[in-house]
């Protein structure tokens, strides 16, 4: 009888312990990708080991499905506690009232240690809707050895890029990539516009009911792209243009740090292990004129907390661990090739992990020039028109002036 009572007491204690656990539901599209699932899981497991009263329940969909899924769940009044976001997803979810204000959850010291352009990009009407879990904005990946073998230097201006393309073409090598030029994801192509000194949909012009699109600089940019197209110098218009860089079909790629692990895995003979650091570097973006600084639009992977979550404080502790801990930096963020969001943590890694021309390139040639992404409620509709106009320049013979004129008219219609 006494043994039975002891067993009953033990079972009650175990049940009570299980019931007292804080459940945090985490939707991570990176957890759904084969290349990154294990690193995400390692951080989740470590957090649960350190916090035995917390259980993280994982969910994942493909990258392309995640935004719509989260929007649908939020509109129905049900979502996960923590969600991994990308692109303009924080803006869309925040304007729908689905995200908690991180200003009320995160320590000021932690936020001050992040890139401010990153935080401003995910701020809507004073509300901080998400924080970076990886500084993932794009850099100008360059195969300097490929350039050197062809007697060429790293380009400084777009004229340099064109002149290099002319020489590369002689050896059946493409002069540039434009692999993101499809769909309506404007953020993926703004690097080109910004570094031709064209700033579509910028907040200052929009406040004056101007699009920021039809400018003299845009005509120069589109004329340049048409000239490159006539040369047949582009490695890709859509699809995954990363492959062209990995197999030396093109000397440049605009991409995040994700090219580091993906390049290693895709072409290990050339880029496996530390060999990638001997082949590739991250250089400054080409600019319109010598002496100009590049302009890098923020594209971060971010974490947000659902406004309806019952465990916001506990969720924030997990978010900070996932984004800003030494363990996450070593076991997850390192595996993505990205830079850790807290700048103090990045500085600690300068003499080891980041002591190469890729990470240093991001830190010195790209991230000092980060600028806020100008999201708005018509981002996707406007983005589709702008991207379609760039496609028309590259893929058709329609006069550049006519492309600009009709696109400007369409933008005026949907924006104002």
What are these regions (language model features)?
Residues 24-41, 373-378:
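Extracytoplasmic "Venus flytrap"
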């Amino acid at each position: 009888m006494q043994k039975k009572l002891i067993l009953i007491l033990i079972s009650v204690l175990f049940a009570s312990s299980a019931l007292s656990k804080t459940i945090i539901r985490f939707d991570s599209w990176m957890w759904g990708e084969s290349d990154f699932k294990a690193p995400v899981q390692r951080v989740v497991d470590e957090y649960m080991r350190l916090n035995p009263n917390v259980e993280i329940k994982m969910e994942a969909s493909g990258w392309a499905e995640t935004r719509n899924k989260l929007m649908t769940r939020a509109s129905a009044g049900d979502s996960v506690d923590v969600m991994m976001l990308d692109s303009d997803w924080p803006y869309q979810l925040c304007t729908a009232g689905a995200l908690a204000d991180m200003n009320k959850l995160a320590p000021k010291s932690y936020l001050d240690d992040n890139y401010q352009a990153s935080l401003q990009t995910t701020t809507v009407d004073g509300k901080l809707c998400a924080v970076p879990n990886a500084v993932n904005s794009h850099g100008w990946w360059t195969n300097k050895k490929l350039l050197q073998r062809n007697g060429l230097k790293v380009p400084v201006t777009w004229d340099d890029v064109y002149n290099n393309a002319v020489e590369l073409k002689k050896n059946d090598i493409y002069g540039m990539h434009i692999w993101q030029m499809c769909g309506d994801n404007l953020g993926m192509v703004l690097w080109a516009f910004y570094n031709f000194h064209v700033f579509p949909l910028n907040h200052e012009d929009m406040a004056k009911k101007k699009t920021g699109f039809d400018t003299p600089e845009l005509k120069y940019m589109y004329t340049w792209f048409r000239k490159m197209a006539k040369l047949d110098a582009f490695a890709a218009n859509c699809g995954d243009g990363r492959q062209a860089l990995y197999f030396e079909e093109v000397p440049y790629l605009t991409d995040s740090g994700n090219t580091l692990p993906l390049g290693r895995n895709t072409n290990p003979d050339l880029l496996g292990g530390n060999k990638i650091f001997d082949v590739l570097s991250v250089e400054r973006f080409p600019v319109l004129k010598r002496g100009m600084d590049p302009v890098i639009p923020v594209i971060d992977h971010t974490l947000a907390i659902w406004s309806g979550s019952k465990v916001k404080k506990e969720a924030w502790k997990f978010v900070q661990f996932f984004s800003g801990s030494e363990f996450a930096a070593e076991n997850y963020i390192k595996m993505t090739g990205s830079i850790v969001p807290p700048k103090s943590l990045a500085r600690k890694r300068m003499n080891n992990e980041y002591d190469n021309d890729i990470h240093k390139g991001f830190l010195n040639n790209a991230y000092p020039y980060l600028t806020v992404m100008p999201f708005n409620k018509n981002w996707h509709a406007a983005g589709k028109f702008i991207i379609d106009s760039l496609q028309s320049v590259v893929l058709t013979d329609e006069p550049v002036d006519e492309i600009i004129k009709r696109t400007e008219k369409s933008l005026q219609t949907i924006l104002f």
